[in-house]
Swiss-Prot record:
Top-level taxonomy: Eukaryota, Viridiplantae, Streptophyta, Embryophyta, Tracheophyta
An MF annotation (GO) of this entry: calcium ion binding
GO annotation, cellular component aspect: membrane
Protein name (record): Respiratory burst oxidase homolog protein B
Regions crossing the membrane: 298-318, 384-404, 440-460, 483-503, 512-529, 660-680
Species assigned in the record: Arabidopsis thaliana
Length: 843
């Protein structure tokens, strides 16, 4: 074949022209074909293919036209909408790869991993930063080696640099060719159906998508059907490129879209971090923001601290005027002042854990709920516990290090006024004090409270402490649960200790019981209610499902008169596991449903045993291919085989306040989505009811639709987790015709869109969803996003859609992103007209 230069197109030409012409050559007896491709403002070399005219037209001509059209697309891509998509597509090195920051780090790793100057294939992934995708990396390595025409299993540093340049280059077409070569192992320029199956299975393994791997034949057939329209049995590079560069259609002509673009631009400018040059003004602004966002907590803490200081001062001054002050001095005033705060705090610490009272107050009184931070009840319980620890320290140190020594070393004349408190016999040593009732009761209380306090810390309660096995058995939730019930003994000892105190003889001066009477009776009354209320009776288990990811869902009958609000939680007791333990779980059914449901993830001994019990029940019925086990009362003849359950509740939680907002932003991590699913179900039920009213099929339904828009973001690590709430996802897609609920599911095991490891999955997802309306990752009608959300973009999206509105942000899950979400809510509230109010779940 010979090449000739082609003249550039004329300036006024508007269309690309492809033409074939037969012309003469140096040898007039030989036929040849010249193919000329003219592109506006570009010049491309042409190729003359020497051969018989019939042969060229039947085969090679077709191939060359495809190649040249591919070249023309390369030139035109820079002017297309897909340009940005192409630039960020098919990246082999992810943004968060540990060594994906430059060649220097890769070279350093090569020096550490190389053996005799060569890097083995097994170390290639570690060297370039693709540590978690060994199979994919091996195929990439072999493809790069094949391109060099060798079959070596190790490479030099020079070869590694060449490979690095290829996989990190800016050219999408070069990366596309590498990806194509990974599949096209015989380098014939064609990908067969079997090779498509291999690359699908490889991509599924790299992204931990086991279900896609199980259905690889179906998905390979789908790709071949889409790309091999002529039924040739193979696809070529240009077919793959066409599919990979498909981008979602976007409407840019509507006024709303134009307005949103303008708002987006405005928000981006407003949200640029700025720093006020005046430090005083900046400090004042930060203080004002702090008070506006935390005023409920501030007034409660201020009141609590003020009461503690007042009680301490009152008792301090009282004892300063007494005779004992002349012998014991300020030691006794500090001891008695701290003792008074201890009485108050030991009474107060019970109130935040009176769950029924708190639930009743936050449900029945909006006024009280608007000024009291009920969401922080457990945090306040911990703050009061810290206050008790400080009080114990001051009280004990003042006695042991100051009071008692001064009393032991007092002269007879000095001790004379103390005889009416201690008797004629003078104390001789510390043992004398310890033998007294107030001595041994005080020490016992301190020991018991210390045990309960230590075992309540998260590193012990959640078995995070690095302890020997023999000691590890003494930690965990069970240890926390039972040690906290030592408070019964502590309160009995506290009353005894207060009654036998040395320096107060009159009964009306022994005030400990006065402080404790109301809180203790209230708490005792609550425990009696839990024991005898209808909600604490046995419930009938209607359905059980065991999902991938160690999640157990229980569907139970709703007790008569049982009323709750979406977002609340209940306590569950299973006597077959432990007759004494009650564990809290968010309700996942909506208040309008005729059943109760919870989803329980196994994270400890109790939940593991509960799942094991119900798994045995679920093994008899038929199972689905995904590993989902189900047992249904409608299919079972003997209900008694279900373990007996008791429930207690419902109890209030932050998520129940969602009805105070027209717009909701719901964020759940993993199993933390449970209270939010209940909210979604409630909004969905309202949509169904509204549709029934509009159709006239049911005129007796209460028309209550407070929520106008709900954005739900659910982030989970495993593909199997997406099955937990697949039913509600499909219902939203079916009934929410007006788009009131916007669902976004994120699977973090899949590499972000644009990564070469997820490119085929993304392509396959689009094809399958377009054809069947089902997402291949979740198995629902809701498309799954990959990697993690950009939370700033999420807040911007909501702010653009809801100008001058209040948005309730409700989060439940791991604490890892609480800080980020809270900062974003504050930032957008301060700099935009959309006000985000952040709420988080406590347990």
């Amino acid at each position: 074949m010979r090449e000739e230069e082609m003249e550039s197109s004329s300036e006024g030409e508007t269309n690309k022209i492809s033409r074939c012409k037969a012309t003469g050559s140096d040898n007039p007896d030989e036929d040849y074909v010249e193919i000329t491709l003219e592109v506006r403002d570009e010049t491309i070399n042409t190729m003359k293919a020497k051969a018989t005219l019939r042969s060229v037209l039947s085969g090679r001509l077709k191939t060359m036209v495809k190649s040249l059209s591919f070249a023309s697309r390369r030139l035109d891509r820079s002017k297309s909408f897909g340009a940005m998509f192409a630039l960020r597509g098919l990246r082999f090195i992810a943004k968060n790869d540990a060594v994906g920051r430059g060649w220097d780090e890769v070279a350093m790793r090569f020096d550490k991993l190389a053996v005799e100057g060569k890097l083995p294939k097994s170390k290639f992934g570690h060297c370039i930063g693709m540590v978690e995708s060994s199979e994919f990396v091996n195929e990439l390595f072999e493809a790069l080696v094949r391109r060099r025409g060798t079959t070596s299993s190790s490479i030099t540093k020079t070869e590694l640099f060449e490979f690095w340049e290829q996989i990190t280059g800016n050219s999408f077409d070069d990366r596309l060719q590498i990806f194509f070569d990974m599949v096209d192992k015989n380098l014939d320029g064609r990908i067969t159906g079997d090779e498509v199956k291999e690359i699908i299975a490889l991509s599924a393994s790299a992204n931990k998508l086991s279900k896609i791997k199980e259905n690889v034949d179906e998905y390979a057939a789908l790709i071949m059907e889409e790309l091999d329209r002529d039924n040739l049995g193979y696809i070529e590079l240009h077919n793959l490129e066409t599919l990979l560069l498909q981008v979602p259609s976007q409407s840019n002509n509507s006024p709303s879209s134009a307005n949103k673009r303008a708002l987006n631009k405005m928000l981006s400018q407003k949200l640029i971090p700025t720093k006020d040059r005046n430090p005083v003004k900046r400090f004042a602004m930060n203080i004002s923001y702090f008070f506006l966002e935390n005023w409920k907590r501030i007034w409660v803490l201020t009141l609590w601290i003020s009461i503690c200081i007042t009680l301490f001062t009152w008792k301090f001054l009282q004892y300063k005027r007494k005779t004992v002050f002349e012998v014991m001095g300020y030691c006794v005033t500090v001891a008695k002042g701290s003792a008074e705060t201890l009485k108050f705090n030991m009474a107060l610490i019970l109130l935040p854990v009176c769950r029924n009272t708190i639930t009743w107050l936050r449900t029945k009184s909006k006024l009280i709920g608007s000024v009291v931070p009920f969401d922080d009840n457990i945090n306040f319980h911990k703050v009061v516990a810290f206050g008790i620890a400080v009080g114990i320290g001051l009280h004990a140190i003042s006695h042991l290090a100051c009071d008692f020594p001064r009393l032991l070393h007092a002269k007879n004349v000095e001790f004379e006024p103390m005889k009416k408190f201690f008797g004629d016999e003078r104390p001789e040593n510390y043992g004398w004090f310890m033998k007294g009732t107030d001595g041994w009761t005080g020490v016992t209380m301190v020991v018991l409270m210390l045990v309960a306090y230590v075992l309540a810390q998260s590193w012990f309660r959640r078995n995070r402490a690095n302890l020997p096995k023999s000691l590890k058995r003494l930690t965990g939730f069970n240890a926390f649960w039972y040690s906290h019930h030592l408070f019964v003994i502590v309160y009995v000892l506290l009353i005894v200790h207060g009654y036998f105190v040395y320096l107060s003889k009159e009964w009306y001066h022994k005030t400990t019981w006065m402080y404790l009477a109301v809180p203790v009776l209230l708490y005792a009354f609550e425990r009696l209610i839990r024991a005898f209320r209808p909600g604490a009776k046995a419930v009938k288990v209607l359905k059980v499902a065991v999902y991938p990811g160690n999640v157990l869902s229980l569907y139970m009958s709703k007790p008569k008169g049982f009323k709750y609000t979406s977002g609340q939680y209940i306590y569950i007791n299973c006597s077959d596991v432990s007759p004494l333990q009650w564990h809290p779980f968010s309700i996942t059914s909506a208040s309008g449903d005729d059943y109760l449901s919870v989803h329980i993830r196994t994270l400890g001994d109790w939940t593991s045993q509960l799942k094991s019990l119900y798994s045995k029940v679920c093994q008899l019925p038929s199972t689905s291919q995904s590993g989902l086990f189900i047992a249904d009362i409608g299919q079972a003849n003997n209900i008694t085989r279900f373990p007996r359950l008791l429930i207690d509740g419902p109890y209030g939680a932050p998520a129940q306040d969602y009805r105070n907002y027209d717009v909701l932003l719901l964020v759940g991590l993993g199993i933390g989505a449970t209270p939010l699913i209940s909210i979604i179900r409630d909004v969905l039920n309202n949509i169904k009811n509204q549709n029934s009213i509009e159709r006239g099929t049911n005129q007796h339904i209460k028309n209550y639709v407070a929520t106008k828009r709900a954005y739900f973001y659910w982030v989970t690590r495993e593909q199997g987790s997406l099955e937990w709430f697949s039913e509600v996802m499909n219902e939203v897609a079916e009934y929410d015709s007006e788009g009131m609920i916007e669902l976004h599911n994120y699977c973090t095991s899949v590499y972000e869109e644009g990564d070469a490891r997820s490119a085929l999955i993304t392509m396959l997802q689009s094809l399958h969803h377009a054809k069947s309306g089902i997402d291949i990752v979740s198995g629902t009608r809701v498309r799954t996003h990959f990697a993690r959300p950009n939370w700033r973009s999420v807040f911007k999206h909501v702010a653009v859609n809801h100008v001058n509105q209040r948005v309730g942000v409700f989060y439940c899950g791991n604490t890892c992103i609480i800080g980020e979400l809270k900062r974003l809510a504050q930032d957008f509230s301060r700099k935009t007209t959309t006000k985000f109010e952040f709420h988080k779940e406590n347990f």
